Structures are given as C-alpha cells and as structure tokens.
C-alpha cells in the first residue's frame, strides 16, 4: 500500500514537471514570435524612412537644378525700345489722279475681230411687213363657202338645212368685198362640213342645232323656230 502511494506521488511530480516544461516552452515560443514581429515592424519603419529620405533628396536636387538654369525670357532685364516720333513736316506721297471710266475699253485685237466678223457674216434680211390686203387674201383662202357643201354629194334637203343654220348667224363681213361669209359663219360652215355626212335627211333646224351644241359646246348656235325642210 505504501508503495502504491509513493508511486502516485512520483507520477504527480513527474506530471507537474512536464506541464511546467511545456508551459515554459510555449512561453519561450510566444516570446520569440513576438520578438520577430517587433523586429519586422522595425525593419519596415526603417525602410519607409529610407524611402522618404531618398525622395526628399531627389526633390531637393531637382529644385536646385531648376533654380540654377537661366531664364529663357528675362523680362526683368529687357531694355525698352526707343521709338522716335515722325516729324510733321513730311509731305504725303503723291498719288496718280483717278480718271472715271466711261465704259469698257475694247482692245485693238477685239475691235479688228469684230470688224472682220461684220464683213464676213451677212446681215439678216428684214421681214417684210404684212399689209391688210395680204392678210385678207390669206384669210379668204382658208374660209370655206356654201358651194363646198354641194361638193359633198349630200341630199338637197340636208344642204338647205345646213344653209339655214349658217344664215342664222350674224352677218358681220370683213373689210374686203371679196368675202361672202363672216368669220362666225365660216367656223360653223367648216364644222358642218365635218358632221354633214353623218346627219339624217329628215331633221328640223331645232334638232340640228341641239345636235350641234352637243357635239361642240364651244360654238354658240342661235335659237331658230322649229320647222322641217322637205325636198
């Protein structure tokens, strides 16, 4: 029994020694780590201080080099330019008199060219003036006559009907005595010559006028009493 108690005491003593050694070792390790961390911080501070000092030295060199260079534009040492006043007794420069131009100046070459052109090219002939007799002859050649209706080989009743329509227009003759029909009658007669072959034989004057107004509304046909024409 005593032996067992002694063994327990020895074991407890050994356990205490091991815990003490372990704690001491951990304390030493933590102290070493803290020392290393402190050393690293010191090194970083030293490096930062060295960089700041190097930058300060560089800036000082640059500033000193800028101050040592001479100024490109020394305005302070610039001398004033002397300006002598112009004397008032100087006469103005004489200018040539201005002659007003009366028109474009033609060169001798252009004048000779125009003269040569006038001699080579013939002048245009003037158109003769038309007198009243010439105009009347031209109009008379274009105005149809009542005899032209008979040349269309129409029935006698239709020819008489067309003649009545022509005679219903006002008798406003031209100046010349050779014309037998007025201008309105000539227009109607020309129009009747175009439509006469297509008209029926038994037709009153009123029906014919209405038919002609439908064909040509631009011509104003006079109103005549309604009666038929027999052969």
UniProtKB/Swiss-Prot annotation:
Keywords: Milk protein, Phosphoprotein, Secreted, Signal. Mammary gland specific. Secreted in milk. The keyword Phosphoprotein applies. PROSITE patterns: CASEIN_ALPHA_BETA. It comes from the Eukaryota. Residues 1-15 form the signal peptide. The modification Phosphoserine is found at residues 23, 28, 30-31. Its main location: secreted. It is found in: Secreted. Important role in determination of the surface properties of the casein micelles. Belongs to the beta-casein family. This is Beta-casein.
């Amino acid at each position: 029994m005593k032996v067992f108690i002694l063994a327990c005491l020895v074991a407890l003593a050994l356990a205490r020694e091991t815990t003490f050694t372990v704690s001491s070792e951990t304390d030493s390790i933590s102290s070493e780590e803290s020392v290393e961390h402190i050393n690293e911080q010191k090194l970083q501070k030293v490096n930062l201080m060295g960089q700041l000092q190097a930058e300060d030295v560089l800036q000082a060199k640059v500033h000193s080099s800028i101050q040592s260079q001479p100024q490109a534009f020394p305005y302070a040492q610039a001398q004033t330019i002397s300006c002598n006043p112009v004397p008032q007794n100087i006469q103005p420069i004489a200018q040539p008199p201005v002659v007003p131009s009366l028109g474009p100046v033609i060169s001798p070459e252009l004048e000779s060219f125009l003269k040569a052109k006038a001699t080579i090219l013939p002048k245009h002939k003037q158109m003769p003036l038309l007198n009243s007799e010439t105009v009347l002859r031209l109009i008379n050649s274009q105005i149809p006559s009542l005899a032209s209706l008979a040349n269309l080989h129409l029935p006698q009743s239709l020819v008489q009907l067309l003649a009545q329509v022509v005679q219903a227009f006002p008798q406003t003759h031209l100046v010349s005595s050779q014309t037998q029909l007025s201008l309105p009658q000539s227009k109607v007669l020309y129009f009747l010559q175009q439509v006469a072959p297509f008209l029926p034989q038994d037709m009153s004057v009123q029906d014919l006028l209405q038919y002609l107004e439908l064909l040509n509304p631009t011509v104003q046909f006079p109103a005549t009493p309604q009666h038929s024409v027999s052969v």
